[in-house]
């Protein structure tokens, strides 16, 4: 089984590589420090499993990487590394193509089990995250039912269309303001207008929307 590990912390990449390489049926063929590099390593090695950190640097979101990689390389099973403060992303990651989730502080045995589970084509979700996943599924179902059939994308202003992909990529208000030569308050106002116009309730919904509109590219 060929594995690629993508995490922006070298200690995580090294530690997980040691654990998995110790297994007779597993080989870590490459590691990556961000979503862009993860895509390149998957393209190069065509691994059976990609272990991907959800919390990537701005511009290289784990959610974006999951969507791009699962679309281009459906044969590679994606296992997401996450923390409790990432719970709002769980449902959206599954929709984007992830096959499972595991907490970064999980025991070695659980990591190995998770890798083998997704490799076999099954879904693995840490029991500690299951409740959050179910709640998010219910909330998303309700949102889908009440959403309008018309697409509000066309009513976004030119500036809002510039800001939307930057927010989705994980850039903060200050970073966006500097990129576009506007004030932080202006960015905050546009962000509020975008969420209102598109009827979006959370950051994961905004990222998913941007992906659907093909506004995000590596």
From Swiss-Prot:
User: Pfam families given for it?
Assistant: GerE (PF00196), Response_reg (PF00072)
What terms describe the molecular function in GO for this protein?
DNA binding
GO CC, any one term: cytoplasm
PTM 4-aspartylphosphate: list the residues.
Answer: 53
KW Hydrolase (keyword) present? no
Xref: SMART domains: HTH_LUXR (SM00421), REC (SM00448)
- Biological process annotations from GO: phosphorelay signal transduction system; regulation of DNA-templated transcription
- Domain HTH luxR-type, by residue range, is 149-214
Report if keyword Protease is assigned: no
**How is the protein modified post-translationally, according to the record?**
Phosphorylated by NreB.
Task: Pinpoint the Response regulatory domain residues.
Answer: 2-119
Cite the entry's keywords alphabetically: Activator, Cytoplasm, DNA-binding, Phosphoprotein, Transcription, Transcription regulation, Two-component regulatory system
Q: Where, per UniProt, does this protein localize?
A: Cytoplasm
| DNA-binding residues | 173-192
Taxonomy, superkingdom: Bacteria
Principal subcellular localisation of the protein = cytoplasm
General function of this protein: Member of the two-component regulatory system NreB/NreC involved in the control of dissimilatory nitrate/nitrite reduction in response to oxygen. Phosphorylated NreC binds to a GC-rich palindromic sequence at the promoters of the nitrate (narGHJI) and nitrite (nir) reductase operons, as well as the putative nitrate transporter gene narT, and activates their expression.
Question: What is the protein's name according to its record?
Answer: Oxygen regulatory protein NreC
């Amino acid at each position: 089984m060929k594995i690629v590990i993508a995490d922006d912390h070298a200690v995580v990449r090294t530690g997980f590589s040691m654990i998995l390489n110790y297994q007779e049926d597993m080989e870590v063929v490459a590691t990556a420090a961000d979503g862009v590099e993860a895509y390149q390593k998957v393209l190069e090695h065509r691994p059976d499993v990609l272990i991907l950190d959800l919390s990537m640097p701005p511009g290289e979101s784990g959610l974006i990487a999951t969507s791009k990689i699962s679309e281009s390389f459906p044969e590679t099973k994606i296992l997401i590394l996450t923390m409790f403060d990432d719970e709002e992303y769980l449902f959206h990651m599954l929709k984007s193509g992830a096959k499972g989730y595991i907490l970064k502080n999980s025991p070695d045995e659980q990591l190995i089990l998770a890798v083998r589970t997704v490799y076999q084509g099954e879904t693995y979700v840490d029991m500690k995250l299951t409740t959050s996943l179910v709640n998010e599924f219910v909330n998303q179902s309700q949102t889908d039912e009440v959403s309008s059939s018309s697409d509000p994308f066309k009513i976004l202003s030119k500036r809002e269309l510039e800001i939307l992909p930057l927010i989705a990529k994980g850039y903060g208000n200050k970073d966006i303001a500097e990129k576009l030569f506007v004030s932080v308050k202006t960015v905050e106002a546009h962000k509020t207008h975008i969420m209102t116009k598109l009827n979006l309730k959370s950051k994961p919904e905004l990222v998913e929307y941007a992906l659907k509109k093909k506004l995000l590219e590596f």
